[in-house]
């Protein structure tokens, strides 16, 4: 898809509200520092990426496409609650990062395929229910953005699942919408291969998937491919959480149909005042985006109910995010409340929330099974949008208005498949 000058202007106009009061921050923050803060907590994650490697160890991976998949073992130190609110990423104001006040990488090692499998097996054994959580980021994310965002989500939800970050080649630019979208297609087979491996690994008992924005397209397409190839999806794929999905609503209808009746529990987070998705709708021929539908209107209400899709409508939730594309980020108290309710096995309704703002469960039935998995369904998207990527928007708007931009161009390469061990249903 070609994104022209008019579309670029629309994107910049829609995002310009984020610029006010936004200070720039250091980039290339991933060079490990000494673990000097005993009060900080640690999040260990497995990274699977189709990005090209960077020559700069503080960047690790660029926004270009790698010729082969890569894996990494990353540990992020997160400062204590006394210096950070739930839903926030404490980006360093200067380098090196200070673990006492900032998110800081204390370990970053590339892994071989076998090393990645060893990491996964060891981490899954530490999980009480032998579960994994796969996170897939959205449009306009640098590698470090996705790492710190997922670390925050894992910390703020208190998940015991083994965390796997799937990060695809995004250039971290509002003017690279077309490139980013094609990069999700480029990564589709690789993600399916990872899903196939998780499905056939006997150590993994449960898989939850969390995707945001454009990352939902990648998640849904890979699940669809897997279902067609295998004649359905495995029972261990329990939860798929779609946060503000930038997906054509008509295409979603066909994707979920192709997965068959025995699909995971889908939870859809929507907001009709999502300005980013309004711009996307213009780009894609005025077709509604899944993340901004009115779930109470026909035909959506009936179709979602028939597919047992739980919808959480956040339209009336007040947000500090001027795009309304990541309301969990600016309303962390709501996420905490929802997570607490769901962890207790309680169904979410308007009256249970007990706040002035309204959260609507638009479909019938319970949100998911009781227990930790149920809590994860709702509480995981604590910060779907990383507010600290905003300086990118400033650079891109400046380039449109004729001002000088500080954006740098990365060099790149090509194709990938996550080379996990081939099993039945996996392509070699």
What is each stretch, according to the model?
Residues 134-138, 212, 244:
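The conserved beta1-alpha1 loop
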